[in-house]
A protein has these predicted regions:
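Short, acidic, metal-binding catalytic loop of nucleotide-sugar glycosyltransferases
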Residues: 13-22
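A conserved acidic beta->alpha catalytic loop
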Residues: 29-38, 82
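Glycine-rich, basic loop-to-helix element that forms the pyrophosphate-binding segment
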Residues: 54-70
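Short aromatic/hydrophobic "clamp" motif used to bind/position activated sugar donors
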Residues: 75
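Conserved donor NDP-sugar-binding/catalytic core segment of glycosyltransferases
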Residues: 87-118
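A recurrent flexible, glycine/aromatic-enriched loop bordering the glycosyltransferase active site
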Residues: 111-113, 127-146, 161-162, 168, ...
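Catalytic donor/gating beta->alpha subdomain of glycosyltransferases that bind UDP-sugars
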Residues: 158-217
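Membrane-embedded multi-pass helical conduit in multi-pass membrane proteins
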Residues: 228-302
Length: 325
């Protein structure tokens, strides 16, 4: 974590409330300047904290160091800026103690929006648990546990990648034959980005990470074809059936966010729900625009350093972090 002082007390308090207490908590700080480390020190008498300061460390470097320092066989991973449900650790660890124990347990995460903008971001970008296909789900490292023996066997978070590092780690675990189990009740809560500008930057970085790692190329190709080929043709040719096709496509693209918003309508004021409904199409456009901008930057980064034929499958996991783009 880095500069998480505002949200850190809630995270630490949620750790203290766990129905199954952790044997140890290894925290790596990436060089915070806002008092994060001092706050951690204040909690040493309430939690079994081990604090490691690594100024300038990337997310992947910090996680790898924390796992290397851990002593237990099962490692549960979360992030700064979240709040854990009281039974999060208990539910995340329980499958390892049963029959046919897995190697990885995928927890879940839900949004905790504090404004109509955050609500719109939540329903547009985050799936509900019922939408997840456990066989294909790639867990976020906000909520995941795995056997440390996988790490000791050489599987690492990719230190050459600044964003999407948990996706690459998941894919490499799958490729190594790790057995996954989905536990949707192991929940962490977190706030979406507070502004559309912050959201755009987040999605630019995610798409740049996809380009760097060679992730989801088909999805990005469809997005480029839609915005850079199909929609310009619709405007240029002005055929009614093309406008109809574009409208049907937009309706299908927006259907799922509106369904999520409808399911959550009782949880928020009516005014919030109405404003979020208006914002959903804008969120889609901003997110797609950010991805259209970020993905080529990532491709260029990979082409210059490794060549476009190399992807997360062949780029070594342990490399000094390259300069940012």
């Amino acid at each position: 974590m880095k500069n998480e002082a505002p949200s850190l007390p809630d995270l630490l308090a949620s750790l203290a409330r766990q129905t199954r207490q952790p044997d140890e908590i290894v925290v790596v700080d990436g060089g915070s300047q806002d008092g994060t480390v001092a706050l951690l020190e204040c909690w040493r008498d309430r939690l079994p904290l081990r604090i490691i300061v690594m100024p300038g460390a990337t997310i992947a470097e910090g996680r790898n160091r924390a796992i290397a320092e851990a002593r237990g066989e099962i490692v549960a991973v979360t992030d700064g800026g979240v709040v854990l449900e009281p039974d999060w650790l208990e539910r995340l660890v329980a499958p390892f103690e049963g029959d046919e124990a897995p190697d990885v347990v995928s927890g879940f995460f839900v949004a905790d929006p504090r404004s109509p903008v955050e609500l719109a971001l939540a329903v547009t970008t985050l799936p509900d648990a019922g939408e997840i296909d456990p066989a294909r789900f790639l867990p976020s490292s906000r909520s995941v546990a795995f056997r440390r023996s996988l790490f000791l066997a050489g599987l690492r978070y990719p230190e050459w990648l600044d964003y999407c590092e948990d996706v690459v780690f998941d894919l490499r675990l799958q490729r190594a034959g790790a057995r996954f189990r989905f536990e949707p009740r192991a929940i962490v809560r977190y706030r979406p980005r507070p502004t559309l500008t912050a959201f755009a930057l987040q999605y630019f970085r995610y798409a740049r990470g996809d380009g760097k790692a060679g992730l989801f190329a088909a999805r990005h190709a469809v997005r480029f074809a839609t915005y850079c080929v199909f929609l310009p043709l619709v405007v240029w040719l002005r055929r009614w059936w093309l406008f109809l096709l574009a409208g049907l496509g937009a309706a299908a693209y927006l259907r799922r966010p509106y369904r999520r918003l409808w399911r959550r309508r009782a949880d928020f004021p009516l005014g919030w729900t109405a404003r979020a409904a208006v914002l959903i199409p804008l969120v889609r456009l901003i997110g797609d625009g950010a991805k259209l901008a970020g993905y080529p930057v990532g491709l260029l980064w990979r082409a210059r350093r490794y060549g476009l034929r190399r992807t997360w499958r062949s780029i070594p996991e342990r490399l000094p972090p390259p300069p940012g783009v």
